[in-house]
């Protein structure tokens, strides 16, 4: 989907913006709390008032800011539905904070965490520990993915982590491709039409976008029907197609 990308210049303020935490709960205070409010109140408010945007917003951080962005997930109703945390310098208590909150969160969240085997040792170790915690969460509202790279060091990691994390963040939004068809759809024991409906419902639930079912996706479901000779499903599929494309007609010769 189309996105508006906002960058914040932190050339001389990165530490005080993202790393001033209290000594007891290890949560933002003073300048870091102010920076949190600046994003939550000023930036989000400005773009909400001046642009037509959905409720699905993504925040990206690396190292100190990768830890900082996690604080947005500790609210009951996070303002960000997508978080990309690249090589986070994890603060004390953060692992337990995230594990506890994401286990019971009611909002739809897409969370992508990344590091490298050649990252700083302390960061890589802590990220791997967080990965284990988040992998164990059983919550249908959380879509969590960890990306552990092999060759990139701490400074080159963003060059591969950013595009791969974005791809993961929007993976559910993509049209059906051969990989999805071969690995999932072709092995379905339930109706492929129901799968298609559910796929687009998830897109709406996670991304707050009412996406029209693509003709490409109708074609893949039709292919399943033909391959398996479940021709009785044509009626169900045609009703859905007419609902999505009432003005469209395709003549198929076989």
Where are these regions (language model features)?
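Non-catalytic cap/lid and distal C-terminal segments of serine-dependent acyl enzymes
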Residues: 1-254
